[in-house]
């Protein structure tokens, strides 16, 4: 039995709390764990003694104070066996690194800057030189002749973005595993990382192996791997198949992530993203199983719970539930002393040209998306409206702050603002098509232009330079 409820009104986006206050049964185990921890702490303090003199009382009280301090130190997070670890870095939307400018001093916000045309130093590699180039990103191969999009360098205000050095990066990655987890935009970034490594150290022995949702790029001399795991909605969903994921009735199991986590639980560096696949008014959330729905339906009917199977809810609320599940897993399973966690902010789309064109041009030409665009948007203050929903960003920020309070550091890599200006850097019509282009599409190229993903070399290389700066610096 599937129950479809009406979509609740979108909450005030200035007050997104990342799922605080939810009453789902799936999170009952957290309350039980907290109660057990409280009970344990109560037992630790429940000491009764018989004192014979004021002097012995003072000595005993001092001893109890020392014991209490020891108990407090070893029972942080309710786990006395937990390995001590350093306090985490703060997880704001913008991460600041020491300035590398000649003026020196202070810190530099790598996410605030401008695009500078630099034909001498960019791109970081040639498309034809990358032996592992993605067919979806090979814009030059598929007919794009205006190559200015390859030569733009991101210039932060007050410092320089470190140039990607493959040998230095692999030195940090020796005997380690880096995993990108997310949707096709995270795969876009993973493909960029492979090209940066492949062209930066072409003499190395590398190999690629795929097993369903997991693809592994192995650098044998370093015993290192850079993997991509397909998980477009972070939690389990009916879009998890790496090829057959275009489904009309998109459904998520907002409280279930273990099936995915099994594939990246031993990673040393994890890079997550999830946004694009949530861009619809409502989402069906399933509390049963994709594998045995009949049994779940029968159990729900027997218990008289009409919402035990599924319910259609506002997509933002579903996203908050999913990100909370992700954060809960990180809190209780990640190795704080070993694993570095990153979350990429929203990659913007350029589907509506009227967002950057003046009114007259928009009225005369109609909407053409990114088709025919060859230059970035110059205005630093430009903000797109249709391609990014900041309420989703705030949901991630809220969970990152919550994890930070629990000594789990998540660095948010803010690629949204710098990428918003690059309307020129999408594949548009210059990519491989898995289905033949129709005559109608040929008459109106903008109707099938890809204004979501990115050409390589291009914008995702800058994302990886930002990631590189955090890992290496």
UniProtKB/Swiss-Prot annotation:
Record-listed E.C. numbers: 2.3.1.-
Lipid bilayer topology: Single-pass type II membrane protein
Positions on the Lumenal side per record topology: 76-473
Comp. bias intervals (Polar residues): 1-17
Locus of motif GDS motif: 182-184
Motif DXXH motif, residue range(s) on this chain: 450-453
Keyword match Glycosyltransferase: no
Superkingdom of source: Eukaryota
Transmembrane segments: 55-75
Gene Ontology biological process terms in this record: xylan acetylation
Residue ranges, Cytoplasmic side: 1-54
Signal peptide feature range: none
Location of the active site: 184, 450, 453
An MF annotation (GO) of this entry: xylan O-acetyltransferase activity
Cysteines joined through disulfide linkages: 108-159, 130-195, 139-455, 370-451
Described purpose of this protein according to its UniProt entry: Xylan acetyltransferase required for 2-O- and 3-O-monoacetylation of xylosyl residues in xylan. Catalyzes the 2-O-acetylation of xylan, followed by nonenzymatic acetyl migration to the O-3 position, resulting in products that are monoacetylated at both O-2 and O-3 positions.
Similarity field: Belongs to the PC-esterase family. TBL subfamily.
PANTHER family listed in its UniProt record: PROTEIN TRICHOME BIREFRINGENCE-LIKE 34, PROTEIN TRICHOME BIREFRINGENCE-LIKE 9-RELATED
Protein name per its UniProtKB record: Xylan O-acetyltransferase 14
């Amino acid at each position: 039995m599937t129950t479809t409820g009406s979509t609740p009104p979108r909450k005030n986006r200035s007050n997104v709390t990342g799922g605080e206050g939810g009453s789902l049964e799936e999170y009952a185990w957290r309350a039980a764990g907290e109660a057990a921890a409280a009970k344990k702490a109560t037992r630790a303090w429940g000491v009764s003694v018989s004192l014979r003199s004021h002097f012995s009382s003072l000595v005993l009280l001092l001893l109890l104070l020392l014991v209490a301090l020891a108990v407090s130190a070893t029972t942080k997070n309710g786990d006395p066996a937990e390995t001590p670890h350093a306090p985490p870095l703060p997880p704001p939307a913008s991460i600041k690194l020491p300035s590398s400018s000649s003026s020196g001093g202070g810190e530099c916000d790598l996410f605030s800057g401008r695009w500078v045309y630099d034909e001498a130093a960019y791109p970081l590699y040639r498309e034809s030189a990358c032996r592992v180039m993605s067919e979806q990103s090979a814009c030059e191969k598929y007919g794009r002749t205006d190559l200015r999009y390859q030569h733009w360098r991101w210039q932060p205000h007050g410092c320089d973005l470190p140039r990607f050095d493959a040998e230095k990066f692999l030195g940090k990655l020796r005997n380690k595993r880096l995993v990108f987890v997310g949707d096709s935009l995270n795969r876009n970034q993973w493909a960029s990382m492979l090209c940066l490594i492949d062209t930066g150290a072409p003499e190395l022995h590398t190999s690629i192996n795929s097993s369903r949702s997991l693809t592994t790029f192995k650098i044998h001399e370093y015993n290192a791997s850079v993997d991509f795991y397909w998980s477009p909605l972070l939690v389990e969903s009916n879009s998890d198949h790496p090829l057959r994921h275009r489904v009309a009735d998109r459904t998520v199991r907002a409280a279930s992530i273990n099936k995915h986590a099994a594939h990246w639980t031993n990673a040393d560096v994890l890079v997550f993203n999830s946004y694009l696949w949530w861009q619809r008014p409502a989402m069906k959330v399933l509390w049963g199983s994709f594998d045995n729905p009949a049994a779940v339906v029968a159990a729900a009917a027997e218990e008289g719970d009409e919402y035990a199977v599924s319910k259609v809810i506002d997509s933002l609320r579903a996203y908050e539930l999913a990100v909370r599940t992700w954060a809960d897993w990180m809190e209780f399973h990640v190795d704080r002393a070993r694993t570095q966690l990153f979350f990429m902010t929203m990659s913007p789309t350029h589907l509506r040209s009227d967002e950057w064109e003046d009114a007259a041009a928009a009225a005369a030409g109609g909407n053409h998306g990114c088709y025919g665009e060859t230059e970035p948007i110059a205005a630093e203050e430009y903000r797109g409206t249709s391609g990014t929903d900041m309420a989703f960003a705030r949901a991630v920020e809220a969970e990152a702050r919550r994890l930070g309070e629990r000594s789990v550091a998540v660095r948010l890599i803010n690629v949204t603002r710098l990428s918003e200006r690059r309307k020129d850097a999408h594949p548009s019509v210059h990519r491989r098509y898995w289905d033949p282009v129709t005559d109608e599409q040929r008459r109106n190229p903008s109707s099938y232009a890809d204004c979501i993903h990115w050409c390589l070399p291009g914008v995702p290389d800058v994302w990886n330079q930002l990631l590189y700066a955090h890992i290496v610096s």
